[in-house]
């Protein structure tokens, strides 16, 4: 374990003493440091009628237990404080460590003993993570140190788990959205699942906009998947034009219906554990799936601003600007009289994507988004540089396939009976509009590009993204983060994992940092919390997170690729082509080991190479035919220990998100020995070699200069490492599988790898 503590708010002695007193700690500035520490420790054992017994189970020195120490005349020293602090946090002498000083250095322990600062040390210790993954104060509250009185209690600028999660209110309302996405002449109704504590105070809201939450149709999804085996189409030379179109909602009328009290209820919904953490701390949770999902009406428009509007309507309702009904019969309305109107959205992938879309509307009431692994341009999710390009792990998927997966109205047999014919008509229109034939950018994709509206974002923004996420690739967060207005507060956590959540990792206090931010933004708490704009997980060592100023630098280093002419054959034998088509992982293994059709260049680094931004391959290329698909991957190559990309459970159910509520496992990315690590990758239709809007012809056997931008990253390579550059055509995971008989030639003497370099 190593501490990377970003959530602790430095506190004055007076404020620290006041907060400790509010928690019931009997500390006195006039007492000695030793007496205050003893009083603090005894309070920790509030379950025991006699605190001598648990105190005797701690050691103050290697030859003296804590009870004996406090009964002695010996003075408090750094050695004693450090040893006791480690044990209070759950570290066991002789098991987790033998030499405390060396262990503290390894931990990067954030508290440095000074006898005159004992009150502040105790305050800091309570806000520090235990071995279990919880802060000490959260651990104590989870054991019942504070009663669940359904009121707010704060410590170090963060809300504590004092809301009773055994008496939660679970209710359903139906919000009227200014939409008619299925064109039935009726405004769409949006189902909203609400979970909130019983409280006399107006509550802020965490909203998870999740098209998955009312169920998914995997059968329809699988039937809709596309075959990837097809020839790369030769496109006509042309210029693509699109226009920015404002979304115009339909008019709604003020509701004059009586207020209803008899609301629909529910017993369970698949919740997000970060939401659960905040539910116990006085934040209502709502789950909304939007248009075209079970319990709602309308068509699944998948990614456009009509879908975004269906979530925006819920925020409008929370602020009294939209109508909600008690049921589909619309006989009574219901008001959000329990809400303070301030909202933060949460969730990963599609969920985080909807958060970004919502933020670009500038809707009042949306105070903050926590968007994890989020899409900012749907074109860049299903296409790349004029190519159909599947997200990593999902060959054959497209946006209409996702529509089939998430149109959960068809899971309700009655809805299927009444509406499926119309749904199929609208789905067919969507399938035509996305233009899978060419892979080109068009108006359909432009309407699903949130980057063009990034300037309208006014809420606080928190993004997390994995630099090994080849599903929602790093370009998605790179472009939106760098497009955000300079006037807003923005934060980015870049980790070394894949498409994963990170709130329950051991090495980073993400949960507590979000607590401090949300208390500021949604509860108006003046806690003086300041979070760095960007925090990056170091790829060279375990559990090390560093502040970074920018994602993408202008300083570059050009690496020569060689002097040869290299030929890349596109065609595979029939058996090999079929085998790779059945198992793209076998293709990837062959590719990375230099066994697939490719041009391969290994560069032995003579000095460290700290990459920060978008690597570009500038290549001299020619094709034997009037078409060409170019793929590239950059590897950190050679056997060594690297961080894995999937977090591993260190302990089971050790994190309590409330008071015995919604427990979850503590996880972390661990080192493993492997032969390579993908640093970046990219794909291009050579007909789109100059830009996305220009489709050009490819002259047979004529040299072309191509700039292929790869996925942005931050990655540190060290002197002596090998950088492997792989150039090839068909990628059996991502691109169409064209097995026609053409070849590309690369002139390495006129080609370079252009690398953005991080400053010291």
From Swiss-Prot:
Pfam families: Peptidase_S15 (PF02129), PepX_C (PF08530), PepX_N (PF09168)
Gene3D superfamilies in the cross-refs: 1.10.246.70, alpha/beta hydrolase, Galactose-binding domain-like
EC number: 3.4.14.11
Principal place of residence: cytoplasm
Keywords: Aminopeptidase, Cytoplasm, Hydrolase, Protease, Serine protease
GO annotation, biological process: proteolysis
GO cellular component: cytoplasm
UniProt similarity note: Belongs to the peptidase S15 family.
NCBIfam families the UniProt entry points to: PRK05371.1-4 (NF003783)
Name listed for the protein in its UniProt record: Xaa-Pro dipeptidyl-peptidase
Gene name of this polypeptide: pepX
